[in-house]
């Protein structure tokens, strides 16, 4: 592609260098100031550009893609409020440790604080939510500047995908001409926007880069020290009981084989959150993976003496409370040295790669299961026998969503009640399911967009399960079905409002319905029609199973609305929990 001006040169350099470090997808929100970047990505042979019209949706789409693939999809937008709409997804990427690279176009620096149109202070807009921020220099056909640009881009991706993955923000100022047109004679005092003849020939390294990345960023894994392994192994060997807890995980998840080896060597059972990457997969046939703990923990009188914890804080509140109240030595394993344990009862922070630590400890101990593990081996299958066919209506939809999902497939589950019902009713199984959710900040915005972004990152079938309010929040995200060519089975559990508030004391207040449950009475069928998506509705488990089984195998997109009543489901959950505790506690 020709380089008629320095903006075109700058945009081409950005796209070329990002391609050398493995970037395969870019997400573009339309706008004028970002034209040099958009054109470069759109015309690049090795990068697939996706154009999404709404910045908030685009950012969540990129988030979902990175959650599924482990690689960022650079986000491009114009100046002004456009980049503010990226912010919710940036927060989720920060708190959930998801790689993200933001390329926000800006006006030339002399327009700052001038009242110029579509001009805001974009510096550090995202605050501490980004791993690093930099305003790039203005485009110029200067060898040192281009080498600096290439270096910055390589470092940005290295930081975004490093030991603590997360967002990196590069602010990119451009002055006109923004299009790939020859630069006009500039006004006095304004830099010439032309690329000198022979520039690339005279400066090949700056203009063309290297055969690979301009700068190779080598990210290492933190090996556990021998002292740490010995101390943990000693604690495990001395304990009468123990437990492995796997919460929502960062990509890549701890290697399943290493967790199987750890469970086998320690004799500890594994409590696997549905978002841990470890509740589903072939390894469950070889390890004591538990998923029903949310309901049966009150029936478990014993507590562990040692707990080894991987990932973020578990979804299950009963499990968090159980760990809080256990007089146990709790080892938090975190490769970035972060702290994600809000009850503040953990005793040890182990800064090490999770897979390497699990393997090292497994090699260092040889312990047989004790009475605590034996009790869990009774409770876990007993729980699933009790609840089979007895799940509350909403819980049954989550149980069926994973049980009937194709093998392999990607399942994205919304916050609020869906992820909790999946935690409670999604039985461990050997199918290869990649189950994802936005548990960093646990918002209900951007759910459809994140799910579709995850689907874009894989050839596996995609299932998205959302509540009605989350669906309402992100109906515009459905445009990605056609614009990005993503097929999905979207399950909308519609209980007409915020059903989760039934679990709070405010339920008894006279203002509960109007201000908290907030029934909306919306008919979602026209929303599917707006985006030319098939729509079906049911209010029964049998109807759902039939519609769902047909949809997941169709290779097309369909929204399946399941109508439920939140008050009844809350009462049914409570009654079932009490029945489980009574039966299993005997």
From Swiss-Prot:
Metabolic or biological pathway, per its Swiss-Prot or TrEMBL entry: Quinol/quinone metabolism; 1,4-dihydroxy-2-naphthoate biosynthesis; 1,4-dihydroxy-2-naphthoate from chorismate: step 2/7; Quinol/quinone metabolism; menaquinone biosynthesis
A single GO molecular function term of this UniProt record: 2-succinyl-5-enolpyruvyl-6-hydroxy-3-cyclohexene-1-carboxylic-acid synthase activity
EC number assigned by the record: 2.2.1.9
InterPro entries per record: DHS-like_NAD/FAD-binding_dom, MenaQ_synth_MenD, THDP-binding, Thiamin_PyroP_enz_TPP-bd_dom, TPP_enzyme_TPP-bd
Entry keyword set: Magnesium, Manganese, Menaquinone biosynthesis, Metal-binding, Thiamine pyrophosphate, Transferase
Cofactor info, note text: Binds 1 thiamine pyrophosphate per subunit.
Cofactor: Mg(2+); Mn(2+); thiamine diphosphate
Annotated coiled-coil segments of the chain: none
Catalysed reactions listed for this entry: isochorismate + 2-oxoglutarate + H(+) = 5-enolpyruvoyl-6-hydroxy-2-succinyl-cyclohex-3-ene-1-carboxylate + CO2
Quaternary data: Homodimer.
NCBIfam families the record matches: menD
Physiological role: Catalyzes the thiamine diphosphate-dependent decarboxylation of 2-oxoglutarate and the subsequent addition of the resulting succinic semialdehyde-thiamine pyrophosphate anion to isochorismate to yield 2-succinyl-5-enolpyruvyl-6-hydroxy-3-cyclohexene-1-carboxylate (SEPHCHC).
Protein family (similarity comment): Belongs to the TPP enzyme family. MenD subfamily.
Protein name: 2-succinyl-5-enolpyruvyl-6-hydroxy-3-cyclohexene-1-carboxylate synthase
């Amino acid at each position: 592609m020709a380089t008629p001006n320095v903006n075109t040169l700058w945009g081409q350099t950005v796209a070329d260098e990002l391609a050398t470090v493995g970037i395969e997808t870019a997400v573009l929100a339309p706008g004028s100031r970002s034209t040099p970047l958009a054109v470069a990505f759109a015309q690049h042979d090795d990068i697939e550009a996706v154009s999404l019209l709404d910045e908030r949706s685009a950012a969540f789409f990129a988030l979902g893609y990175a959650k599924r693939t482990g690689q960022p999809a650079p986000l491009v937008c114009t100046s002004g409020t456009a980049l503010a709409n990226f912010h919710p997804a940036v927060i989720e990427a920060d708190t959930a440790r998801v790689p993200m690279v933001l390329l926000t176009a800006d006006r030339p620096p002399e327009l700052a604080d001038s009242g110029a149109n579509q001009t805001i202070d974009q510096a550090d807009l995202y605050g501490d939510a980004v791993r690093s921020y930099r305003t790039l220099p203005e485009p110029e056909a200067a060898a040192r500047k281009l080498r600096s640009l290439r270096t910055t881009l390589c470092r940005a991706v290295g930081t975004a995908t490093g030991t603590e993955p997360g967002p990196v923000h590069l602010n990119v100022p451009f002055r006109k001409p923004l299009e790939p047109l020859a630069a006009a004679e500039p006004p006095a005092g304004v830099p010439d926007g032309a690329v000198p003849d022979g520039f690339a020939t005279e400066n090949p390294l700056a203009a063309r880069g290297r055969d690979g990345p301009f700068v190779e960023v080598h990210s290492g894994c933190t090996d556990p020290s021998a002292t740490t392994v010995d101390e943990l192994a000693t604690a495990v060997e001395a304990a009468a009981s123990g437990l492995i807890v796997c919460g929502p995980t960062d990509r890549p998840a701890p290697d399943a084989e290493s967790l199987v080896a750890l469970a086998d060597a320690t004799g500890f059972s594994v409590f696997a959150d549905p978002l841990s990457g470890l509740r589903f997969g072939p390894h469950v046939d070889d390890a004591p993976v538990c998923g029903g703990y949310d309901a049966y923990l009150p029936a478990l009188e014993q507590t562990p003496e040692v707990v080894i914890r991987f990932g973020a804080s578990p979804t299950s509140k009963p499990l968090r409370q159980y760990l809080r109240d256990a007089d146990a030595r709790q080892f938090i394993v975190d490769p970035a040295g972060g702290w994600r344990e809000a009850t503040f009862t953990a005793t040890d922070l182990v800064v090490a790669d999770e897979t390497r630590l699990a393997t090292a400890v497994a090699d260092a101990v040889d312990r047989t299961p004790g009475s605590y593990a034996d009790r869990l081996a009774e409770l876990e299958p007993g729980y699933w026998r009790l609840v089979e066919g007895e799940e509350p209506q909403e819980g049954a939809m989550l149980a069926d969503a994973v049980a009937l999902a194709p093998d392999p497939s990607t399942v994205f589950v919304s916050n609020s009640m869906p992820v909790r019902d999946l935690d409670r009713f999604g039985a461990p199984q050997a199918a290869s399911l990649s189950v994802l959710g936005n548990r960093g900040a646990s918002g209900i915005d951007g759910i459809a967009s994140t799910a579709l972004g995850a689907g874009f990152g894989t050839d596996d079938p995609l299932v998205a399960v959302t509540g009605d309010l989350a669906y309402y929040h992100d109906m515009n995200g459905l445009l990605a079905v056609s614009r990005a060519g993503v097929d999905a089975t979207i399950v909308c559990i519609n209980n007409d409002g915020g059903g989760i508030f039934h679990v709070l004391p405010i339920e008894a207040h006279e203002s509960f319905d109007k201000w908290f449950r907030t029934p909306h009475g919306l008919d979602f069928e026209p929303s599917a029609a707006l985006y030319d998506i098939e729509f079906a509705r049911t209010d029964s488990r049998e109807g759902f199973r039939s519609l769902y089984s047909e949809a997941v195998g169709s290779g097309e997109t369909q929204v399946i609305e399941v109508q439920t009543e939140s008050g009844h489901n809350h009462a049914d959950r409570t009654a079932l929990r009490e029945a489980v505790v009574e039966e299993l506690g005997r």
